[in-house]
Amino acid sequence: MKLADKKADRGFVAKGDEINYAKRSNDELIDLLKSRIAIERTIGARLLGSRGVVSVEYLLMALKTEKKLYPRLEICCSLARIGEPSIDGLIQLLGVIGNNQHQTPSEEPFLKVSYPLPRDLAARTIIRIGHAALPVLCGVLNEDHPAKISEAIDAIGFICSKGGADQYLKTLMACYNKFKNNDLLRWKLFRAMSSFTESLTFLEKHLSVENNPAILQEIKRSIRIINKNKR
């Protein structure tokens, strides 16, 4: 199979190729989103991004079941483009889609200075909406659903790494106190604290008591990033 055919099979549509469908009604675009043809699903998802809140429910349903790369990417782009009306639905999908999420602390060091992109698809979409999602994400940390909390922490850490959200450190601290015996959440929380200069003392305190090598490595990384950002 030629490269172009492979991309078409995965639903690739070049920018601008959707123009012939632009005047279709919302219902017609929703039907495209349900098509058996991946290219049509991509077109439907792309155009629904400009139709606002009425599209959110259908895009979220499609995101749960879509297996092809390009329609899935376009669904995420449209949900992010619609913005705040997408947040609550995406929150419900944290930790639900796919199996790419971390299940244990990674022993592979993350060497970049930038905050790592979430591996969870819903979290990765939420971070594109930005600071508006933080209050709802922090609400997740009060739940008793570790898999969902795990992905919310990634999104909070990423968004807060861009600055202007120092008030959310207290929420992360409270989450730490609640889940400090959960290795995965502890690892992710120490990573998220790299986004907050005020967490330095807390991180340094745990540097001497943490005994999990992967988590200890993450504490050191967060301390290093904070000290670099303070210069």
Enumerate the language-model features and the residues they cover.
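Structural detector for internal amphipathic alpha-helices that build alpha-solenoid repeat scaffolds
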Residues: 1-21, 38-53, 61-62, 70-85, ...
